[in-house]
């Protein structure tokens, strides 16, 4: 009987240690700027069901990639494209099996000021509004996938002398801020950012044929020691509940 009690006590002690270990873990997630608000919502939902703390770092995908290469502590990288996530795998910092497309981005051309206020907008209407615009906000296409998609869209529209009008921000979050403060007449932003605005913003939902697909890939970075909390959140991202919130 004493032996059974000892085994039971050992089992309960092991469970409490495991729970303590998980609760002490902090999962560090590096996310592209366009996904920040959605991730904050997912973080709250996850933390309400798990005794695990989530820390979020946000910047353009290019800057986050560079920081990861320099050795910054990151458990999960949520890139706004496939390219940089795949480069992390190529650098042997993550396994190909620990990655998946968590979202497909939608690009929108937003007219926050008085230049163009329309409830519905076609490609041709958006083109005319861009011609009238003196300042156009865009994320830096070198480091930000949404910026690259915006530049491809501008090229597809065939507008002359557009480069002179471009105001480049470091990431899509800063581009949205330019529009919100009306420091630009037009801004290429993520459609997910416009959903939080009150009223009916004037925008054109850019056709996917105007730019390369914005496939956003998540990677679980390899660790010397298995990080169970990070794995739990990574699996949560794949869940139907999380995907409903993302879409």
Tell me what each language-model feature is.
Residues 75-79:
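Periplasmic-binding protein-like
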Residues 2-9:
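Sec-dependent signal peptide recognition
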Residues 17-49, 55-58, 62, 66-70, ...:
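Exported/periplasmic ABC-transporter solute-binding proteins
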């Amino acid at each position: 009987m004493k032996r059974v009690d000892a085994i039971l006590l050992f089992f309960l002690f092991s469970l409490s240690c495991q729970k303590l270990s998980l609760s002490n873990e902090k999962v560090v997630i590096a996310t592209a700027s366009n996904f920040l608000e959605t991730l904050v919502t997912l973080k709250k939902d996850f933390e309400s069901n798990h005794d695990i703390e989530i820390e979020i770092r946000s910047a353009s995908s290019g800057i986050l990639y560079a920081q990861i290469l320099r050795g910054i502590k990151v458990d999960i990288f949520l890139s706004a494209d496939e390219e940089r996530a795949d480069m992390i795998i190529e650098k042997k910092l993550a396994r190909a099996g620990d990655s998946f497309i968590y979202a497909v981005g939608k690009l929108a051309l937003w007219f926050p000021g008085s230049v163009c206020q329309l409830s519905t907008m076609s490609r041709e209407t958006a083109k005319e509004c861009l011609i009238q615009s003196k300042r156009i906000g865009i994320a830096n296409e070198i480091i930000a996938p949404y910026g690259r998609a915006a530049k491809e869209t501008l090229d597809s529209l065939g507008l002359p002398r557009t480069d002179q009008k471009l105001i480049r921000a470091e990431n899509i979050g800063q581009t949205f801020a330019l529009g919100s403060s009306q420091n630009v007449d037009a801004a290429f932003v993520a459609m997910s950012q416009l959903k939080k605005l009150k009223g009916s913003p004037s925008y054109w939902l850019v056709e996917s044929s105007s730019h390369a697909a914005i496939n956003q890939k998540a990677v679980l970075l390899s660790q010397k020691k298995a990080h169970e909390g990070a794995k739990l959140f990574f699996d949560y991202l794949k869940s139907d509940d999380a995907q409903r919130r993302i879409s």
